[in-house]
Amino acid sequence: MAKLDAYFGEYGGQYVPQILVPALEQLEQAFIDAQEDPDFRAEFMTLLQEYAGRPTALTLCRNLTKGTKTKLYLKREDLLHGGAHKTNQVLGQALLAKRMGKDEIIAETGAGQHGVATALACALLGLKCRVYMGAKDVERQSPNVFRMELMGAEVIPVHSGSATLKDACNEALRDWSATYETAHYLLGTAAGPHPFPTIVREFQRMIGEETKMQILAREGRLPDAVIACVGGGSNAIGMFADFIEEESVKLIGVEPAGKGIDTDQHGAPLKHGKTGIFFGMKAPLMQDEHGQIEESYSVSAGLDFPSVGPQHAHLNAIGRAEYGAVTDDEALEAFKILARNEGIIPALESSHALAYALQLAQAEPEKEQLLVVNLSGRGDKDIFTVHDILKEKGEI
């Protein structure tokens, strides 16, 4: 039986109850077989093109970098059906579930974007769907909850722990360990136990592949850097995957600094965490001196995750990718700037990557540089959050 690497350097692995090992082994083999099956790949590509709307555009932001010599492009995953990059890999995993003969899907969601993507894929492909969501997130993301329910998903609020994403993850895994014979756990990011980080990367890889072709067609060269926000890390690894071997291209991931890295209210485990075991993997983790998981924080629910995907941890460890952090205030400023100067309302998650790119442009205005930001999602889900913050600050 062919096997995928379970580790990226020292990170990754499969730290799960023994009962789940057969399900993960079955998933790994099904994925390997599917990747080698031209019919599966053709069905996946057809769904991406005809249902999801790929390829997505690469947009030059002419107004954002005025006064500098930076050319800034956005990879427009916000234009994908469902409103974010999540749709890509969800369609892939849902097809995989059908291939394995499973008719139920379990998922977890934070901001609700992965839940919405899972619900739409299940509606399309005729699968039953239940989504675990922290009770706090159910409150702050009510439009997405209703979207999921409209498409036939059962949304299950999780009240344990901090009632956020990490608790939803734990409940989803608990459910799967009791139902794995009929259900597939459709994990929402490039993290968790092997083989999920690899599967999610491969089902998001087209982001970087398209970007490479589009930028070569537009500019005749590769970008100096590709920049993406990092929570669990799926949109970033989707952008990075096809550029890892291109050593001239900097890979820049942006974690949420929340209210400041020097406070305890951030979500930056890569730079400020310690290695531990969480969610079935070995990875950097926000934990206290007793090894207990600390609460992560970000204005963006989708980045509010106390760990990070193992391949990002490895890319950071070997110096192939660099990871910065952007505060809530910096992300909000970038959100406003993009809306007012380009007529694009980005997700708060994506606004972190945009803020970092704008800082690079402004730091060296005379430097000619070609940057691509992965605009991983649209900001419809965030307008009420932003409205309340701006009102509190007296800006509206």
UniProtKB/Swiss-Prot annotation:
- Please give the catalytic activity noted in the UniProt record: (1S,2R)-1-C-(indol-3-yl)glycerol 3-phosphate + L-serine = D-glyceraldehyde 3-phosphate + L-tryptophan + H2O
For this protein, what is any one GO molecular function term? tryptophan synthase activity
For this protein, the record's Gene3D superfamilies field holds: 3.40.50.1100
**Swiss-Prot/TrEMBL cofactor(s):** pyridoxal 5'-phosphate
Modified positions (N6-(pyridoxal phosphate)lysine) are: K86
* Cellular component GO terms, alphabetical: cytoplasm
For this protein, the Enzyme Commission number is 4.2.1.20
Alphabetically ordered keywords of this record? Amino-acid biosynthesis, Aromatic amino acid biosynthesis, Lyase, Pyridoxal phosphate, Tryptophan biosynthesis
Entry superkingdom? Bacteria
For the protein in the UniProt heading, the enzyme class is lyase
Pathway per its UniProt entry is:
Amino-acid biosynthesis; L-tryptophan biosynthesis; L-tryptophan from chorismate: step 5/5
> What HAMAP family has UniProt attached to this entry?
Trp_synth_beta
Q: What does this protein do?
A: The beta subunit is responsible for the synthesis of L-tryptophan from indole and L-serine.
Regarding protein family, the annotation reads: Belongs to the TrpB family.
- Assembly and oligomerization: Tetramer of two alpha and two beta chains.
- The name on file for this protein is Tryptophan synthase beta chain
State the organism of origin: Aliivibrio fischeri (strain MJ11) (Vibrio fischeri)
Q: What is the lineage of its organism?
A: Bacteria, Pseudomonadati, Pseudomonadota, Gammaproteobacteria, Vibrionales
